[in-house]
Amino acid sequence: MSNVTPMMQQYLKIKSEYQDCLLFFRLGDFYEMFYEDAKEASRVLEITLTKRDAKKENPIPMCGVPYHSADSYIDTLVNNGYKVAICEQMEDPKQTKGMVRREVVRIVTPGTVMEQGGVDDKQNNYILSFVMNQPEIALSYCDVSTGELKVTHFNDEATLLNEITTINPNEVVINDNISDHLKRQINMVTETITVRETLSSEIYSVNQTEHKLMYQATQLLLDYIHHTQKRDLSHIEDAVQYAAIDYMKMDFYAKRNLELTESIRLKSKKGTLLWLMDETKTPMGARRLKQWIDRPLISKEQIEARLDIVDEFSAHFIERDTLRTYLNQVYDIERLVGRVSYGNVNARDLIQLKHSISEIPNIKALLNSMNQDTLVQVNQLEPLDDLLDILEQSLVEEPPISVKDGGLFKVGFNMQLDEYLEASKNGKTWLAELQAKERQRTGIKSLKISFNKVFGYFIEITRANLQNFEPSEFGYMRKQTLSNAERFITDELKEKEDIILGAEDKAIELEYQLFVQLREEVKKYTERLQHQAKIISELDCLQSFAEIAQKYNYTRPSFSENKTLELVESRHPVVERVMDYNDYVPNNCRLDNETFIYLITGPNMSGKSTYMRQVAIISIMAQMGAYVPCKEAVLPIFDQIFTRIGAADDLVSGKSTFMVEMLEAQKALTYATEDSLIIFDEIGRGTSTYDGLALAQAMIEYVAETSHAKTLFSTHYHELTTLDQALPSLKNVHVAANEYKGELIFLHKVKDGAVDDSYGIQVAKLADLPEKVISRAQVILSEFEASAGKKSSISNLKMVENEPEINQENSNLSVEETTDTLSQKDFEQASFDLFENDQESEIELQIKNLNLSNMTPIEALVKLSELQNQLK
């Protein structure tokens, strides 16, 4: 340390206190980074890495960014999961002898971003904490930008992971007793996990609760937020307690597979249920909509209350259109209030707040013309006329962005300010007169009087006009020489400059003081403004439901008392939107207490997965309180939805497709109740044919015998279709397809009964696989079918094993061994026959040479008849 300069000693001391952050160290007009921070920041920000003391033996790596444009660089780092500690100069270097005092004034983390450009308007930016005292777990989460703060508790890690998935925080704060295994699972949702080993001694204002663990979780969270932000956060609301069991439960897999808020392929909003339903007009409404999608209701009373309002908006489409116009003028009240409390609000933000609250009386008057018994929110809307008057009387309509450059307040708002502004204005009038006088006196028509912050006011004469010009004759004193001009000052101009700049400086200083006072006055309205924002966001969501209902021809769902699900002409809302409405084929679905399992067969690409997804999505929409894409819809209220759809390796945790499949199935089989909905799409395809078939059948039987959950189960194991003989609760349905002139035509219509062909080769043909591959596949398929003989389901194999005539060779085998032995022998024989070298008959040669992929069904029957006649 002896060779390190005092300034670098100061840097190293501060850095030692913020080891987990990149330190932005203020030096003049730049934020500098050194050592490993500089290497890391230069790589992520793609800026030049230089060296301090480059001529010394061990130069220090460094990089920097201008302070006036630092926000964009900070946003980039935070979006990449870094924390940034902002270290400012706490003294004016011009007025300080020796080292300037520096302090970290704020730590920007992924979960505490407050700047307008650093957060998505339509997304919450949550930070979450939890504490454990087995078996109890308490969880608290907050959006610092809006002030929302909630807390809950439960008794199992599965609910913890579900809640973290639902909340989708950008940062998680934990104490140091959390297992590494649990940390890895949390890392699947968020990259930023902060371990907070000890709490500060300060106790923050939290609603008192009898539940000690919830109090601790909230304290842990607020302590961390105050530690990083280091300023007033009075806009953070009192913690609101909620219970996870008050909402439909969907785990990470269900939300991903159903593409509720993020598409699987594009990882974006487009193509999701959120994308379809978002006809909101305010950022608050858009965030509320996402919350409602993530947490469908399970209270019939609450659902019906929302539906009643959607009814009202649907019936009054003219009023709804007017409401949308009013809402379009409302800015993000929640985040504007947050910035007021936080201290980074500017005058333009307050003008946005003024425009927003000026629409509240319009909205209230409009809703008063509708059914007030239904629209309970109308009584909670509060025109904030007193705040509106304050903002109207104080700020100009188009103030500058900076609050330290003046020009914020209207004339007449403050007498002292008016005097300063008048003096400045008169001075500038005098300057204009002086410029005209000097042009006449010198005869130089291009002479001008200008100003900059470095040199103040000056007279500028271009070099072309300086020939034969003697400055001293006119009392001009040279102030600055440029390549194409000279700048001068006179005693008279200097005297007036002091008066003008003195008035301007005093005006700017006074305006800033007045703005701080105005900000503190607005802060008093925080709670009332937050309540109005909540009401407006709910109205925005509900008018959005009515808008999409009218636009896409949706209907109001009803809820059955006997747990029946009956959808008439149902459609997948997202698929329907990206297609032509008239091209979409609607389908029915009926599940009740007697028949609660659909076994769905049909070709690949026929629409089995879409059909199952649409049942789940319609259920979610209904429990959000929205209309649904059906002609008629009667639904039970589901407590949970489980899905197993599509193939997805989990590379991060090293799980194979089949392992992921089994984990998703395990959750459904373990936690589903008779009030749950299960979507199983082709279970078992990630393993061998017979393992997969056995597992699929066992799962169907388990659901039928235990949970009785409503279940949609698609499969290509056609052996399973015989299960309806043993399971009265199971019904076979299929997605229809036809062959016409050798081409496969998907009808996308779900019909009763099973099909025994998946048309895999025809689908491959549609995908334009090489003709040689298609032809060879046809031959191999024919050989398999000929050698395999009569197909048997596993249930049939069980029955064979119980027959007294069973082959003695297998008499001592278990059911599983018998099944495996029979199946493997059949399979091996089928494979072996493909390579037999016995002399082929003429008929076999004819069959072998047939180009089946290019034959129509009629042509194939004619050829078959010819071959049959040859054998007679």
From Swiss-Prot:
PROSITE patterns registered for this protein in UniProt: DNA_MISMATCH_REPAIR_2
Pfam families with a match to the protein in the record: MutS_I, MutS_II, MutS_III, MutS_IV, MutS_V
Top-level taxonomic group: Bacteria
Binding site for ATP: G602, P603, N604, M605, S606, G607, K608, S609
InterPro entries to which the protein is assigned, alphabetical: DNA_mismatch_repair_MutS (IPR005748), DNA_mismatch_repair_MutS-lik_N (IPR007695), DNA_mismatch_repair_MutS/MSH (IPR017261), DNA_mismatch_repair_MutS_C (IPR000432), DNA_mismatch_repair_MutS_clamp (IPR007861), DNA_mismatch_repair_MutS_core (IPR007696), DNA_mismatch_repair_MutS_N (IPR016151), DNA_mismatch_repair_MutS_sf (IPR036187)
SUPFAM superfamilies linked to this entry: DNA repair protein MutS, domain I, DNA repair protein MutS, domain II, DNA repair protein MutS, domain III, P-loop containing nucleoside triphosphate hydrolases
SMART domains according to UniProt: MUTSac, MUTSd
GO MF, one example: damaged DNA binding
Keywords: ATP-binding, DNA damage, DNA repair, DNA-binding, Nucleotide-binding
Keyword Acyltransferase: no
Any one cellular-component term (Gene Ontology): cytosol
Keyword Transit peptide (UniProt): no
GO terms of biological process kind: mismatch repair
Function: This protein is involved in the repair of mismatches in DNA. It is possible that it carries out the mismatch recognition step. This protein has a weak ATPase activity.
HAMAP family according to UniProt: MutS (MF_00096)
Family label: Belongs to the DNA mismatch repair MutS family.
Record PANTHER family: DNA MISMATCH REPAIR PROTEIN MSH1, MITOCHONDRIAL, DNA MISMATCH REPAIR PROTEIN MUTS FAMILY MEMBER
The name this protein goes by in its record: DNA mismatch repair protein MutS
Origin species: Staphylococcus aureus (strain MRSA252)
Organism placement in taxonomy: Bacteria, Bacillati, Bacillota, Bacilli, Bacillales
Encoding gene, per UniProt annotation: mutS
